[in-house]
């Protein structure tokens, strides 16, 4: 019996399945979905998938992503709500994974893994209340919602990816204590396995989604502190648009605040003294790289975009320093970060549209991360 199966057996013996809206999740922004509205939404997923790709348009930001293969149907061709409930409330195969960017970051003496939940919106079924809800999983999102990477690419192309994120969210909200125990045990296993080989384990929270509720943040903090107390060579880091979690210095989590957060969250943060990331629009750099058409750039053997000429690298640094009002001497490419961390907030780091790792987000000597939009 694996970890998930063992814990699942114990939880059903001990607890009532219900979302604690009154206490643990009182801060969650949600809306109830009537059964007929859910059926309509799921049928719309099937109808949309039947259209040519150039006719589908973008999915509204207030709708959760559901893959067409995740919409079960009866023999009569109608949406099978019961089967959908069973599917999204099934325990996820795992809470921790490793995407392509984390693989690039895992080198030498570091092993980087990540976890996430649906971006912007997710569907949750209250197992005790018997109701569906749309949950706002990124309540601090501002301009980043328009270009959210976690609502495109593999996150929407593959049904197992989007379904696993949805299952994580449902486990988190229906059984938060179980969620915490599973993710702790998964991380501990990695720590034991990797640490004995001299490899440090790094965990990125919010690969997709955000700390949409204080409870989720508390789980991340609790798991991190427990692993550190046990003496594991481990660290946690995260991107967030939630200003309330940037000032908690006891959390042992390296936080990166997104400057594309909404005004309410921006007002809670001193941007001049906060480690942060910002999305750099294409207009600021597209002419510096070799285009292959269709908005794509020619890539070198390392996967990074090629500059048109030798002056491009320095020109990009100058443009960023001027646009974001930071000293030119502080602007460096991620590949030029020294192997040993320097004093906090020393560098402002360029992360290219492709080929770069997530190292800048993990280091406290990096103040501002320039994320060149994909």
For every predicted segment, state its role:
Residues 2-374:
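Class I S-adenosyl-L-methionine
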């Amino acid at each position: 019996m694996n970890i998930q199966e063992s814990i699942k057996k114990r939880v059903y013996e001990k607890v009532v399945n219900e979302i604690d809206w009154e206490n643990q999740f009182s801060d969650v922004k949600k809306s109830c979905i009537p059964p007929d509205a859910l059926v309509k939404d799921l049928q719309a997923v099937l109808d949309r998938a039947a259209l040519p790709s150039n006719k589908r348009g973008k999915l509204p930001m207030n709708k959760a992503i559901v893959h067409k293969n995740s919409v079960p149907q009866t023999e009569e061709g109608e949406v099978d709500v019961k089967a959908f409930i069973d599917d999204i409330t099934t325990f996820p195969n795992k809470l921790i994974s490793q995407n392509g960017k984390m693989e690039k970051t895992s080198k030498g003496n570091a092993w980087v893994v990540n976890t996430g939940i649906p971006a912007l919106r997710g569907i949750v079924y209250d197992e005790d209340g018997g109701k569906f809800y749309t949950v706002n999983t990124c309540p601090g999102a501002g301009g980043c919602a328009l270009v959210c990477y976690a609502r495109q690419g593999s996150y929407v192309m593959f049904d197992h990816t989007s379904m696993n994120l949805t299952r994580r969210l449902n486990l988190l909200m229906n059984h938060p204590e179980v969620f915490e125990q599973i993710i702790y045990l998964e991380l501990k296993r990695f720590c034991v396995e990797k640490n004995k080989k001299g490899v440090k384990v790094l965990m990125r929270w919010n690969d997709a989604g955000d700390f949409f509720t204080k409870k989720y943040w508390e789980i991340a903090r609790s798991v991190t502190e427990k692993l550190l107390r046990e003496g594991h060579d481990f660290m946690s880091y995260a991107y967030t648009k939630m200003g309330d979690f940037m000032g908690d210095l006891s959390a042992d989590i390296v936080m990166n605040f997104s400057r594309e957060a909404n005004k309410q969250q921006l007002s809670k943060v001193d941007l001049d003294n906060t480690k942060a990331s910002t999305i750099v629009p294409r207009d600021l750099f597209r002419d510096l790289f070799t285009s292959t058409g269709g908005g794509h750039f020619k890539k070198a053997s390392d996967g990074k975009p090629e500059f048109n000429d030798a002056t491009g690298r320095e020109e990009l640094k100058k443009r960023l320093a001027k646009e974001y009002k930071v000293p030119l001497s502080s602007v460096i490419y991620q590949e030029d970060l020294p192997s040993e961390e320097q004093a906090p907030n020393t560098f402002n780091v360029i992360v290219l549209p492709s080929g770069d790792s997530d190292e800048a987000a993990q280091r406290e000597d990096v103040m501002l991360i320039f994320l060149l939009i994909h």
